[in-house]
Amino acid sequence: MILIKNAQIVNSIDNKLEKADILIVDDKIEKIGKNIEENPDKMIIIDTSGKYVMPSFTDIHCHLREPGFEYKEDIKSGSRAALAGGFTTICCMPNTNPPVDNRAMIAYIKYRAKEVSPIEVLPVGAITKGLSGEELAEIGFIKEEGAIAISDDGKCVMNANIMRNALLYSKDFSIPVISHCEDTNLSEGGQINLGYVSTITGLRGIPREAESIIVARDILLAKETKAHLHITHVSTKESVRLIKMAKEWGVNVTADTCPHYISLTEEEVLGFNTNAKVNPPLRTQEDIEALIEGLKEGVIDCISTDHAPHHKDEKNVEFNLAASGTIGFETAFSVLFTYLVEKNGFDIGKIVELLNYNPRKIIGLSPNIIKEGEKANLVIVDLKKKWEVKEENIVSKSKNSVFLGKLLTSYVETVIYNGKILKKDGVLSC
């Protein structure tokens, strides 16, 4: 049994509870109430005075690199990194080697996760065979085997007819399509956002239209097919406007953005910082403001990390040769609190919705909620703690965080999943 004392519970922006004790028996919340009787001989007692307790988080877009790229990350190490950041459900993308484009690979991911992961790992299947963009994968079999979505993330399905057919099949099989929106004819050879910083550094720029053109195309295809389109890692103000328009039309579209897009601009690249090389690229302050407004209005539904680990040798090279991507599990909540709550006045309950309720709804899962009779999946956070992101404290195999050296506010201290304490006072126990 676990007894959490003096918990300030936050389930969502509309459903907050006053301070209470939480009694966990086995894997469920047995009781929530004032002054629950302590029994130190039978209970693990955690005093959360001055801290907040909220449902654990879900990430619908990450990369675990297994199979094929285990030197960057694997299911075990990636799951531990996610756990360190408060995530107990993560959805891994299919751009592995071989790609997750058939039912056997879906089965492998599920089996491997059950074997080595302390948390829930849900596979995303490919839209096309080999992520080639040329022939649809067997979407029905992929869904039947347990995929929660389909995506060619890392690559855009450039053929509009292939994408249209994918949406039609996805509707028949009731599975969302997660779209990586990038017109590669416009972005080819690009390194960073096309603009001031690309001009002064001499790095080839990626025009913002590379994203927004495909966003517009896929919205129109979703409008026609009535399928569920999810647009991932939104980075431009134009994309926000297009998604808002689509929702006003009644299109079945949802969207996410990532912590680095709502906090950092293209200027992070100055000095040729390869950790700031991500895809889509970091944009401008104007884009950040549009994304934040989109989150406030509900145009952008949730936050994903796009956790993209790379080996140090893939980043410690000339900028144009460096791999794109940043790790994100361990800093996600703190970045959102620092840049949305502290700097932009968001309610802490809104962050819980962006990391729990909304992403789970998108992939068809019921939300984690702190309530009697529900599974005990929760995190304890210290909202006042300030900490610097340092390589030596990163749990992930890879250390390529764009937030290295940044000072963040709030810290996920303790994580409980299915009634088990997997992280306590900052230390993982799995």
Curated annotation (Swiss-Prot):
GO terms for molecular function: allantoinase activity; dihydroorotase activity; zinc ion binding. GO terms for cellular component: cytoplasm. It is an enzyme of class 3 (hydrolase). Pathway: Pyrimidine metabolism; UMP biosynthesis via de novo pathway; (S)-dihydroorotate from bicarbonate: step 3/3. Zn(2+) 1 binds at residues 61, 63, 153, 306. Its cofactor is Zn(2+). Binds 2 Zn(2+) ions per subunit. Catalyzes the reversible cyclization of carbamoyl aspartate to dihydroorotate. This is Dihydroorotase. The keyword Nucleotide-binding does not apply. Zn(2+) 2 binds at residues 153, 180, 233.
